[in-house]
């Protein structure tokens, strides 16, 4: 990020939000809330962001925290927007998910805790990682537009 796009997002540590689930439920559309705060998953192939090819930034749909740059996006063939690296390591957090037979690693927005998706070790170089994101969990901001302010 450069210029005004960078100003409000980088600093010493991530300011975590402490909103309740009820507050998020009132602030978000039901489908977004389900994915972000009930750890739901959207149907594969349902997100228009799969076909998003413009330069820009993918931000958390709950709090506007910048999570991914378009330069790290790739077509994984899975039906979900996929990235091989986050915009900044401290903008996401991971935890083990035991909902299926085999454990997986899920990742969340480090600021609001909103569930984004799962990370796998089958991505392209240079990281070998695939951040498989729910499209409803992020919003795309084209490079020529200012990023929206962070939501408190």
PLM segments and residue spans:
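A short Gly-Trp-Pro
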Residues: 15-152
